[in-house]
Amino acid sequence: MGAIDLSFSQSLLFSSSRSNLSSSTHRSVSFLPPGSKSRCLPPLRSMSHDDDTASKEVKLWGGRFEESVTEKVEKFTESISFDKVLYKQDIMGSKAHASMLAHQGLITDSDKDSILRGLDDIERQIEANKFEWRTDREDVHMNIEAALTDLIGEPAKKLHTARSRNDQVATDFRLWCRDAIDTIIVKIRNLQRALVELALKNEALIVPGYTHLQRAQPVLLPHVLLTFVEQLERDAGRYVDCRARLNFSPLGACALAGTGLPIDRFMTANALGFTEPMRNSIDAVSDRDFVLEFLYTNANTGIHLSRLGEEWVLWASEEFGFMTPSDSVSTGSSIMPQKKNPDPMELVRGKSARVIGDLVTVLTLCKGLPLAYNRDFQEDKEPMFDSTKTIMGMIDVSAEFAQNVTFNEDRIKKSLPAGHLDATTLADYLVKKGMPFRSSHDIVGKLVGVCVSKGCELQNLSLEEMKKLSPVFEEDVFGFLGVENSVNKFSSYGSTGSNCVAEQLGYWVNKLNITST
């Protein structure tokens, strides 16, 4: 698979009416005043530098320091190598912040316009791969702010008014997570469609259902496939819930205590599509529960996908032989010429361990931290980025696999008679005749014992053999025996009966807007 882009386009939620900015929600937010014209600034001047120059550049926080950090400390503490993927969100937050500062009279409109145009130019440079990310500038925030200062000078120094990197990074990360969730939900819908379409192509196919990996009862294949559709729907719901809880703005909380400057946090929250500002400034910068919830949801989704992978790896084996993946989603062996392996689904199963591990990493990271912000939080990014990239790949390849498999109907049908799959249906027959279920369970168990000793199936027994165990059996019993008859007897809501499964399929066809297969 190709690399997955982890920079997401920003989508906005409903805006707060308390803002002085536009309350439109489903269009891009403009941070230029009406009637102003955007102009393209000259390219950033070269930021190439040797080690000498780098060591002499004063850190933006360096006022009280008399020595530069050592090279080892600088390399150990930098995060630009991974947090630069937040550049869109960082620029977006800075635009909203600058517009608010101007609106509140904390900077001039001229300064604001210079800042906005400079940020636009930096974004273009980044997207054209012409921006030089500098380790000595530590992180995405400092790289962009320092570059903005190089570009426009004095106005850039006013941008950080009433803002700390503590609330800045929390804002950026919430925006990133919000966009990532939107992308994942779209991918889940695509996988659900692939599974439903596969079910529609095999609507009447009966397969063995298993418990303890032992044959249990006959079920329709669409019923099995819709199991994963339902699980994915709950996963999507968890993402929606997570998105709603994280969609509150930390911006303006500053380091931890807020500010005495007359900022408008509702204005920036609205501009960025947040529901409203977070109520408590310490909470805004000191908690990463939104990251944990997102990581848990990825892990839970990963477990569901892992079980799908396990099912299909088994079914593709010679021992089962229920499905055949196409060559386009299979791989071979370097030594065994005959091999055709369902590697994508094996890796889906395997990569679930990564998303679980990423969750455990951040759970451990957050345990026992004192209030408020701690540099430990820098370590929440890589697990989050890895988990998100991994779960997206797992979802995508599962959909690809579902679109490139065929079920071996003849092989499945030949295997169906084995295992006495209709035994429970036979017990239900006796219940319908008035027998207590425990008694019917005992009688059918004894009939299975007869079949095992004779090497036959229940439907091969004669009526006389059945009557030896209970006079309740009549000729109509044969309408309950055999996998087809057994499946047709299921009628409870959500069951594997043909009518029930048809209703389930109809529900998902409508919900997912599937028009053809």
From Swiss-Prot:
GO terms for biological process: arginine biosynthetic process via ornithine; L-arginine biosynthetic process. Its EC number is 4.3.2.1. GO terms for molecular function: argininosuccinate lyase activity. The record marks 346 as: Increases basicity of active site His. It catalyses: 2-(N(omega)-L-arginino)succinate = fumarate + L-arginine. The active site is at 212 (proton acceptor), 333 (proton donor). NCBIfam families: argH. This is Argininosuccinate lyase, chloroplastic. It comes from Arabidopsis thaliana. The lineage of its organism: Eukaryota, Viridiplantae, Streptophyta, Embryophyta, Tracheophyta.
